[in-house]
């Protein structure tokens, strides 16, 4: 569960790499210096539902990799009003 320890509260990226061979792919999830890689040949299924991204390996005994994509929360009314005031001041 290295991934859970690494990414809590920090931005995380999901990347699909294509190697020189046109049929060889690799999925990488990383934050800062920590990287988790999945060769395409070892992935059985990939699914995404709302904020949950799941990678299932071919080895059924191996645990599924679950990645929760961060979503930006909508601005509160106070923040929206402050942004509107700032915009109005800049346009004057």
Swiss-Prot record:
User: What is a single cellular component term in the Gene Ontology annotation?
Assistant: microvillus membrane
Instruction: Fill in the PTM field for this protein.
Output: Phosphorylated by tyrosine-protein kinases. Phosphorylation by ROCK2 suppresses the head-to-tail association of the N-terminal and C-terminal halves resulting in an opened conformation which is capable of actin and membrane-binding.
Q: Which UniProt keywords apply?
A: Acetylation, Cell membrane, Cell projection, Cell shape, Cytoplasm, Cytoskeleton, Membrane, Phosphoprotein, S-nitrosylation
The domain of life is Eukaryota
Q: How does it sit in the membrane?
A: Peripheral membrane protein
Subcellular location field = Apical cell membrane; Cell projection; Cell projection, Microvillus membrane; Cell projection, Ruffle membrane
Q: Which GO terms describe its biological process?
A: regulation of cell shape
Keyword check for Repeat: no
Which GO terms fall under molecular function for this chain's record? actin binding
Q: Where is this region: Interaction with SCYL3?
A: 42-92
Tell me the domain comment: The [IL]-x-C-x-x-[DE] motif is a proposed target motif for cysteine S-nitrosylation mediated by the iNOS-S100A8/A9 transnitrosylase complex.
Briefly state the protein's biological role: Probably involved in connections of major cytoskeletal structures to the plasma membrane. In epithelial cells, required for the formation of microvilli and membrane ruffles on the apical pole. Along with PLEKHG6, required for normal macropinocytosis.
- This one is known as Ezrin
